[in-house]
A protein has these predicted regions:
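Short, flexible, basic/aromatic active-site loop/helix in glycosyltransferases
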Residues: 135-174
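Conserved donor NDP-sugar-binding/catalytic core segment of glycosyltransferases
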Residues: 98-130
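Glycine-rich, basic loop-to-helix element that forms the pyrophosphate-binding segment
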Residues: 64-81
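Short aromatic/hydrophobic "clamp" motif used to bind/position activated sugar donors
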Residues: 86
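A short, conserved alpha-helix in the catalytic core of glycosyltransferases
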Residues: 166-167, 175-194, 198-226
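A conserved acidic beta->alpha catalytic loop
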Residues: 17, 39-49
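Active-site-adjacent helix/loop segment of glycosyltransferases
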Residues: 207-261
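Short, well-formed alpha-helical segments that are part of the catalytic scaffolds
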Residues: 14-29
Length: 261
């Protein structure tokens, strides 16, 4: 859509929920000219790509010849886009149109906000605590350690790390939001060069937030909009994803300094 206001960017790789997600987007948005959907496929299987082609009536789809990761795909979709706002959108998110419209209205009203994130829910309606106030090695140890007695000993620290005390009655400035759903000013995304695509997956969203903060840009959480996220916690279950997570964590701390506690 040449005159769209929002570019909605989705990066896929054999994504489990994508077709349910795309059906939801068709139902919610139809061919609304305010929104342009751009999908970047990271060399999924032939069968998957053939199914994805069925949605070329609602989205511009790039089928790439190799998998260079999450940040690379979103940069490909967005760094040359002309829309005012960019929406980084996971292929496992269910969105109601009115929730996005409320977020756009917030950015329209307050030009000091660079990045806006909503409340993220599980399929059962409970909250996913994905916002972070800090990033430290010890906090990641606590998240991954399998012993509940250790988690209980540091329950207060984990609650603080996961920002479990965020208000439900007002928007609030935060330090780090989740890349599963980020509404950004296009200019600010371009000014920082988009995502650092040296991260294949994981930590590129944290890195983007730190880059924005370094430039005194505001990142805000709104509890008045919500999305449903079919969160897989892949790094907790899959050894290959855990290795990717650890590599990205190493890159992050090498770039921003090692914070142990």
């Amino acid at each position: 859509m040449a005159n769209a206001k929002v570019a909605i960017s989705i990066v896929t790789y054999n994504s489990k929920h994508i077709f349910k997600v795309l059906e939801n987007l068709k139902q919610e948005f139809g061919h609304d000219p305010q929104f342009r959907f751009v999908i970047f496929d990271n060399n999924s299987t032939d069968d998957y790509q053939n199914r994805l082609k069925e949605y070329q009536d609602i989205a511009d789809i790039t089928f790439y010849h190799e998998n260079n990761g999450f940040g690379f795909g979103h940069n490909y979709n967005l760094l040359h886009a002309s829309e005012k706002y960019f929406l980084v959108f996971n292929p496992d998110i269910i969105l109601v149109r009115d929730d996005l419209l409320k977020m756009i209205e917030i950015l329209d009203r307050d030009e000091t906000i660079s990045l806006l994130v909503p409340k993220v829910l599980n399929a059962d309606g409970t909250t996913q605590h994905l916002i972070r106030d800090r990033v430290s090695v010890f906090d990641y140890f606590l998240r991954f350690v399998p012993f509940q007695i250790v988690k209980k000993m540091f329950a207060g620290r984990l609650a603080s790390y996961e920002c479990r005390d965020l208000p439900d009655d007002r928007n609030v400035e935060i330090r780090i939001g989740s890349g599963c759903f980020m509404l950004l000013r296009g200019k600010d995304f371009k000014d920082v060069g988009g995502f650092d695509d040296r991260y294949f997956m994981y930590f590129e969203d944290y890195d983007l937030c730190i880059e924005l903060k370094k430039r005194n840009k505001r990142i805000v959480y709104t509890p008045f909009s919500n999305v449903t996220h079919y969160y897989e916690r892949g790094a907790h279950k899959n050894s290959n994803l855990f290795k990717i997570f650890m590599k990205s964590m190493y890159k992050y701390f090498n770039k921003w300094g090692w914070k142990w506690f």
